[in-house]
């Protein structure tokens, strides 16, 4: 989750390593992800790989149905927005990892608890 520098580079590295990858972005930041369904280039130490992500979406339900492992690659100021988007959608069967952590796991857990949501495994 998150289509900025860290989110996109993490998604492409996971795709290069053979994983199925969904990239989710909040609707208010969707400008940064609207062209990401096209072929993308990952350039790493003089090697260029052409990659396609499996799913690029602004629909939280699609993203959570796609994978039980969620990597939130967003700055600290975005934790609240993503926490609210995940509320009543995420389940205890999911695993949420925050990158970078900055104790965002505590904030995410508090948001989910406040919204009476299920609490997944949360890590940083």
Regions found by a protein language model. Name each.
Residues 1-45:
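NAD(P)+-binding Rossmann beta1-loop-alpha1 motif at the extreme N-terminus of oxidoreductases
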Residues 18-20, 52-53, 93, 119:
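A generic structural signal for alpha->beta connector loops
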Residues 35, 65, 110:
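Charged/polar, solvent-exposed surface patches and flexible loops
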Residues 37-58, 123:
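N-terminal glycine-rich dinucleotide-binding loop that anchors FAD/FMN and/or NAD(P) in oxidoreductases
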Residues 49-97:
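Rossmann-like NAD(P)-binding element
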Residues 76-124:
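Rossmann-like NAD(P)(H) cofactor-binding subdomain of soluble oxidoreductases
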């Amino acid at each position: 989750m998150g289509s900025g520098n860290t989110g996109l580079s993490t998604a492409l590295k996971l795709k290069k390593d053979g994983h199925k990858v969904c990239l989710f972005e909040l609707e208010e930041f969707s400008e940064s992800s609207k062209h990401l369904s096209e072929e993308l280039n990952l350039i790493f130490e003089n090697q260029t790989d052409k990659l396609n992500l499996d799913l690029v979406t602004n629909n939280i339900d699609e993203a959570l149905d796609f994978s039980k492992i969620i990597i939130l690659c967003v700055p600290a100021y975005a934790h609240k927005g993503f926490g609210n988007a995940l509320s009543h959608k995420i389940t205890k069967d999911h695993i949420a990892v925050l990158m970078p952590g900055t104790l965002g796991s505590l904030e995410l857990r508090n948001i989910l608890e406040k919204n009476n949501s299920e609490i997944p495994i949360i890590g940083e």
